[in-house]
């Protein structure tokens, strides 16, 4: 079975990701909320998307913006009530929009009742629901030494000492995010019922599965190899990403999901897998295997980041980006697998600043080119709030303004290990300016109104605004301008539906002139069509050659209104899609 012969709604859908804290504040407290999302569903419908993915709205102490969950079955009061959530789901469904929610079950919050019980005593029945270990020993000052040398993603040790029982618990993310022990079957069943079952019973249409490759840890939790001898804690991902039982767990959870929905209802699951090889990806997303519908790969959004330290930039070429992006979908060729296409999410900066040009001259046209690229690729398209406006990164923020725990945690670790004035710190700030997670988390600009672009009435937002709303980069201005990035995205999504046979399901992807450092070109096929796509990733007029001089080329979409499809010269940041005959 090949991908073209197995159409599904979730393959053809475009999913619009919403970050609740930053979308729309309905009660003027400076935080977005679920009622705010409901109030703007007509805007989402106008764009032409098929589903929304709503980031965590569950009860949480907000150490990591809701990815530290204290109660899977309750809405965080600042976001509203459970009834507000049920109404949001109902109103979305009335508009033909499906609702995907976040499933954050590698870890929970230390405020979750399960962890409180586990923490209370070594004899507690839930003790084994988390990873508790005694100190490896004590240093010369009598301080307990962590059980292994794993480094947390947010800096420092992945272990936190708990005075009450004299043991450490594992947290590969923030200090207050203890990892679940998925080896414990009772724990798994409780997770499924509370996080998956509850929301399926309340009519959600699927899940985005957070860090879905990390549930299975290698037995014994061994020390990681020392790859950076200048720091005490090392990258331990080989011991907890794509672990020995991970596929068993996903099959079990998939079967549980099927048991919770009416016959005939097909839910959507997308896993944040991140890294791995093609064989891993195929097992996760094969229809026959029954684990996930699709997955997110991080390779293309990580280009230019030092693998040993995210907040340290390294040079990359357009070829590097092409190859990395293609990893998102090449593994599904001639399989029953599926995947995703995205450039932005809540953990990424703005794509026009990262991969296009956010200069006033080229921001709009390069945003449109990136939209053309996204809709031309095979896989399910995901758009992040503000991307449809061509939002750029914010400018010139001090560390005191940064809210992201990854950024502040890395800053604290570098300050401790290297010093405030070190070369390492200088590189950190260079990287933070480009790739801070906060770039995607600033409040959505609904208008040019001061002080907060219509996000709140007059309350100070929880995070500072992106100043670009004053430059016409806001929903109100773009909805009045038929040539805006918003309306270009709307048209692009219509074109994707009209040509879904080649744009959504096309296969046999082939790079053309892969080494070219200005042009991204490829062909792909259906059973009876062939497409040629060409994109100019530069601010120069650039000539290109077609792959087959004997064929005729009909341009059917592009990002320049005045483009001549017969010309073999692209304007700056131009993208074109051709059908061949």
Curated annotation (Swiss-Prot):
CDD domains in the record: AmyAc_SI_OligoGlu_DGase
Molecular function in Gene Ontology: alpha-1,4-glucosidase activity; alpha-amylase activity; glucan 1,4-alpha-maltotriohydrolase activity; oligo-1,6-glucosidase activity; sucrose alpha-glucosidase activity
SUPFAM superfamilies named among the record's database cross-references: (Trans)glycosidases, Glycosyl hydrolase domain
Alphabetized UniProt keyword annotations: Glycosidase, Hydrolase, Maltose metabolism
Record bears the keyword Flavoprotein: no
UniProt-listed InterPro entries: Glyco_hydro_13_cat_dom, Glyco_hydro_b, Glycoside_hydrolase_SF, O16G_dom_2
E.C. designation(s): 3.2.1.10
Family designation: Belongs to the glycosyl hydrolase 13 family.
Function, as annotated: Alpha-glucosidase with specificity for isomaltose, maltose, and palatinose.
Protein name: Oligo-1,6-glucosidase IMA5
Organism of derivation: Saccharomyces cerevisiae (strain ATCC 204508 / S288c) (Baker's yeast)
């Amino acid at each position: 079975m090949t991908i073209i012969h197995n159409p599904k709604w979730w393959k053809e859908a475009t999913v619009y990701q919403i970050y609740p804290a930053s979308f729309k504040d309905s009660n003027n407290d400076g935080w977005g909320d679920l009622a705010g999302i409901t109030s703007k569903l007509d805007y989402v419908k106008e764009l032409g998307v098929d589903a929304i993915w709503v980031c965590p709205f569950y009860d949480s102490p907000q150490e990591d913006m809701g990815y530290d969950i204290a109660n899977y079955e309750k809405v965080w009061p600042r976001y509203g009530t459970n009834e507000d959530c049920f109404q949001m789901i109902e109103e979305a469904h009335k508009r033909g929009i499906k609702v995907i929610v976040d499933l954050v079950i590698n870890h929970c919050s230390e405020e979750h009742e399960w962890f409180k019980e586990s923490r209370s005593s070594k004899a507690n029945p839930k003790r084994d629901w988390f990873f508790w270990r005694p100190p490896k020993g004590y240093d010369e000052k009598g301080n307990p030494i962590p059980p292994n040398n794993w480094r947390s993603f947010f800096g420092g040790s992945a272990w936190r000492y708990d005075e009450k029982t004299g043991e450490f618990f594992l947290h590969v993310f923030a200090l207050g995010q203890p990892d679940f022990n998925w080896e414990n079957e009772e724990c798994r069943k409780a997770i499924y019922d509370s996080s998956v079952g509850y929301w399926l019973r309340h009519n959600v249409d699927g899940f985005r599965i957070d860090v879905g490759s990390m549930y299975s840890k290698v037995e014994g939790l061994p020390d990681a190899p020392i790859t950076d001898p200048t720091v005490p804690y090392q990258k331990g991902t080989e011991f907890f990403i794509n672990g020995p039982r991970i596929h068993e767990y996903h099959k079990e959870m998939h079967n549980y999901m099927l048991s919770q929905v009416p016959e005939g209802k097909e839910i959507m699951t997308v896993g944040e897998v991140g890294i791995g090889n093609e064989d891993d990806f195929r097992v996760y997303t094969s229809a026959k295997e029954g684990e996930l519908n699709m997955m997110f790969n991080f390779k293309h959004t990580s280009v230019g980041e030092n693998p040993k330290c995210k907040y340290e930039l390294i040079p990359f070429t357009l070829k590097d980006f092409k190859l990395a992006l293609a990893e998102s979908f090449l593994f599904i060729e001639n399989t029953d697998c599926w995947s995703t296409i995205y450039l932005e999410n809540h953990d990424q900066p703005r794509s026009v600043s990262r991969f296009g040009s956010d200069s006033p001259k080229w921001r709009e046209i390069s945003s449109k080119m990136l939209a053309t690229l996204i809709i031309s690729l095979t896989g399910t398209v995901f758009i992040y709030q503000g991307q449809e406006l061509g939002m750029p990164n914010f400018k010139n923020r001090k560390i005191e303004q940064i809210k992201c725990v990854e950024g502040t945690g890395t800053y604290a670790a570098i300050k401790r290990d290297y010093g405030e004035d070190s070369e390492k710190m200088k590189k950190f700030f260079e990287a933070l300016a480009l790739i801070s997670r906060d770039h995607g988390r600033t409040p959505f600009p609904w208008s040019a109104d001061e002080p907060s672009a219509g996000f709140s009435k007059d309350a100070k937002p929880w995070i500072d605004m992106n100043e670009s709303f004053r430059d016409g980069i806001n929903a109100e201005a773009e909805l009045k301008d038929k040539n805006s990035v918003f309306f270009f995205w709307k048209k692009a999504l219509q074109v994707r539906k009209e040509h879904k046979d080649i744009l959504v399901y096309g296969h046999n992807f082939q790079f053309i002139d892969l080494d070219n450092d200005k042009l991204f070109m490829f062909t792909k096929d259906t059973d009876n069509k062939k497409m040629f796509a060409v994109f100019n990733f530069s601010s120069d007029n650039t000539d290109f050659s077609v792959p087959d001089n004997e064929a005729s080329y009909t341009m059917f979409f592009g990002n320049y209104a005045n483009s001549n499809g017969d010309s073999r010269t692209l304007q700056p940041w131009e993208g074109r899609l051709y059908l061949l005959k």
